[in-house]
């Protein structure tokens, strides 16, 4: 669960390395976002010749959280870090690679391209 002003790693090769969450989309009083939710972020750290630059405001989808998620079958899945993938307006990723595992819930929320690029789906 990530809230406003949380810092997350970027799990793709779009050029950003770290982002800060500005706003959780999906409601005016929504306090936190979980895996599969779209957030508006500001790029805090970036590589010099990447697609996105430092200070740029982008949309991203959350792919990993330390808080984790509880599934209907009783499993509790959590990760070592908080990570996002930067997306375009049509829900497709801006980068061409995704690093690290992603949660299975992304497939249910319609992010099939991110799931297919990921090396492991938990």
UniProtKB/Swiss-Prot annotation:
Name of a matching Pfam family: Ribosomal_L14
NCBIfam families for the chain: rplN_bact (TIGR01067)
The entry's protein name is Large ribosomal subunit protein uL14
Which of UniProt's keywords are assigned here? Ribonucleoprotein, Ribosomal protein, RNA-binding, rRNA-binding
UniProt lists the family membership as follows: Belongs to the universal ribosomal protein uL14 family.
Q: Where is it found, in Gene Ontology cellular component terms?
A: cytosolic large ribosomal subunit
Q: How does it assemble?
A: Part of the 50S ribosomal subunit. Forms a cluster with proteins L3 and L19. In the 70S ribosome, L14 and L19 interact and together make contacts with the 16S rRNA in bridges B5 and B8.
What PANTHER family is this protein classified in?
A: 50S/60S RIBOSOMAL PROTEIN L14/L23, LARGE RIBOSOMAL SUBUNIT PROTEIN UL14M
User: Does Heme show up as a keyword for this record?
Assistant: no
Q: Which CDD domains does the record cross-reference, listed alphabetically?
A: Ribosomal_uL14
Q: Does the keyword Transport apply?
A: no
Q: What does this protein do?
A: Binds to 23S rRNA. Forms part of two intersubunit bridges in the 70S ribosome.
Gene Ontology molecular functions: large ribosomal subunit rRNA binding; structural constituent of ribosome
Q: GO:BP terms for this protein?
A: translation
